[in-house]
Amino acid sequence: MLLNIANSIGKRTIRLAQSIGKFSIFSLAAITSIIRPPLYFSLIIKQLLFIGFYSLPVVAMTTFFSGAVLALQSYTGFSRFSAESSIATVVVLSLTRELGPVLAGLMVAGRVGASIAAEIGTMRVTEQVDALYTLSTDSIKYLVFPKVIAAIITMPCLVLIGDVIGVMGGYLVGVYKLDFNSSTYLTSTFQYLEPIDVISGLVKAGVFGFIISIISCYSGYYSGKGAKGVGRATTSAVVNSSILILISNYLITELFFKV
């Protein structure tokens, strides 16, 4: 009994170590491919549109209603302590520091991460990845590099736009539903907002973009055989990306705002 338990733990530990090593080598190969030609500008532009532009409606809707709900809930709580004047500040700081980057990251992970994993996984199953080797093409450079670069570039842009739209959602609720004075609300919005609040959110966005793209590409690149393998790769990409987004969000927050 004890021998079986020890054997099971040993196998899982070895499997985990192998996965970490394989992922580290894969990530290093993707990063070092940046300095090697060709740069595949056409593929990068295509991924910029796919990851950035086509994700904008989802991110905009998410952040808009998050800002609106945040203003509404803050009013419900702060009115008990006659602190309604702090609502605008809470909305803008919550969005720029935390909600904007995290919500955008989770939405992009669900939309883009699943698509990338399914695309590369299907190419692996249908032996298109092997065909790239026969054509003397670096498959990681061709498949992974454009997606990673595009995700790192577009995520901060999406978060910045999402922050503005989220603050707008809070403004509309605050002014037109809660009857705040427009100029007073705007003054409170920017009174305590500092550059570090926005910068920290943009740094998070860039890190989230790298996490989403590299994990999704890795999951698809090493997907199992058949439709079941592609399905597992897709699920793994979304779940692992989401978990690492939340973990890295805490670590970056700790780095920028040491308490």
UniProtKB/Swiss-Prot annotation:
Cell compartment(s), UniProt: Cell inner membrane
Chief localization: membrane
Topology relative to the membrane: Multi-pass membrane protein
Keywords (A to Z) from UniProt: Cell inner membrane, Cell membrane, Membrane, Transmembrane, Transmembrane helix, Transport
Residue ranges that the Swiss-Prot or TrEMBL entry lists as coiled coil: none
One CC-aspect GO term: ATP-binding cassette (ABC) transporter complex
Molecular function terms, GO-annotated: phospholipid transporter activity
Membrane spanning stretches: 25-45, 49-69, 148-168, 195-215, 237-257
Secreted listed as a keyword: no
Function: Could be part of an ABC transporter complex.
Family: Belongs to the MlaE permease family.
Protein name, per record: Probable ABC transporter permease protein RBE_1340
Biological classification of the source: Bacteria, Pseudomonadati, Pseudomonadota, Alphaproteobacteria, Rickettsiales
